[in-house]
């Protein structure tokens, strides 16, 4: 079994608030290309954390690819309370993350800051690599996860950057 964690910018972090934003289709084209590459190289599990934005779009693409490839999808939420305060539109997306092949909640609820590092350590230990939409020019809290991932020998990282997206949109 080979599992890849998929994570990246949340929609508000890159200013995309409408699913019909033309940038979403460019991002999804890149996702499709990269996920097919993973599948053709033996990956059989895509792991998500349940965030809006990049993960949401990658989940949509992964579900489409299930018609062509034998893949499994999991969502490992940080807390059972994930998404409880979301609006109805976003809760529809949350239901898609809960309708995958495997769902786990790492903690019942928030108690202390160390839960975040424990969660990311768990994700790193349970996956062989990560596909991350992230650019060092636009830092977020993902930088902590990426630092841990880069420190792990043999952990494979594939970054989708703004430069890669620009190249794809021009071709």
From Swiss-Prot:
InterPro entries: YspA (IPR010697). Gene3D superfamilies: 3.40.50.450. Pfam families: YpsA (PF06908). It comes from the Bacteria. Belongs to the UPF0398 family. This is UPF0398 protein SPy_1647/M5005_Spy1353. It comes from Streptococcus pyogenes serotype M1.
């Amino acid at each position: 079994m080979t599992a890849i964690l998929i994570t990246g910018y949340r929609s508000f972090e890159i200013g995309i608030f409408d699913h019909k934003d033309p940038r979403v289709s460019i991002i999804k084209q890149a996702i499709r290309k990269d996920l097919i590459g993973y599948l053709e190289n033996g990956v059989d599990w895509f792991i998500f954390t349940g965030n809006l934005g990049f993960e949401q779009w990658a989940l949509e693409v992964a579900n489409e690819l299930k018609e062509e490839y034998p893949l499994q999808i999991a969502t490992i939420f940080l807390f059972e309370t994930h998404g409880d305060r979301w609006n109805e539109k976003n809760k529809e997306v949350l239901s898609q993350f809960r309708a995958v092949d495997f769902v786990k909640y790492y903690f019942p609820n928030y108690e202390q800051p160390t839960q975040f590092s424990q969660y990311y350590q768990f994700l790193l230990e349970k996956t062989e690599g990560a596909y991350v939409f992230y650019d060092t020019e636009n830092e977020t809290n993902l930088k902590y996860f990426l630092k841990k991932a880069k420190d792990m020998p043999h952990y494979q990282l594939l970054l989708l950057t703004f430069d890669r997206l620009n190249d794809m949109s021009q071709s």
